Amino acid sequence: MSLDAATKKQIITEFGTKEGDTGSPEVQVAMLSRRISDLTEHLKTHKHDHHSRRGLLILVGQRRRLLQYLAKKDIQRFRALVDRLGIRRGAAGAK
């Protein structure tokens, strides 16, 4: 499930460092988190949709790797992002 343009723009303005910032880890993690929450809601209704479940696991792994990178590079930005998004630190893959 992909995000529509309005949602992407809203996430970029909220988490980006400048206009059109799509590459920073904060924006990427925020977009992945939104897609993960959307897929989680979808799977609550469609319990046997195994293709979407696999996609969800791939997205969670991708988000975990981005969070590990951010924790290694700048722990303050990592902690601020985890607090803003409400992600558990254990799920983020950093100590």
Curated annotation (Swiss-Prot):
Keywords assigned: Ribonucleoprotein, Ribosomal protein, RNA-binding, rRNA-binding
Record carries keyword Ribosomal protein: yes
UniProt GO cellular component terms: cytosolic small ribosomal subunit
Cleavable signal peptide: none
Top-level taxonomic group: Bacteria
GO terms under biological process: translation
GO function term, MF aspect, one: structural constituent of ribosome
Keyword NAD among UniProt keywords: no
Family the entry assigns: Belongs to the universal ribosomal protein uS15 family.
Protein name: Small ribosomal subunit protein uS15
Species per Swiss-Prot/TrEMBL record: Streptomyces avermitilis (strain ATCC 31267 / DSM 46492 / JCM 5070 / NBRC 14893 / NCIMB 12804 / NRRL 8165 / MA-4680)
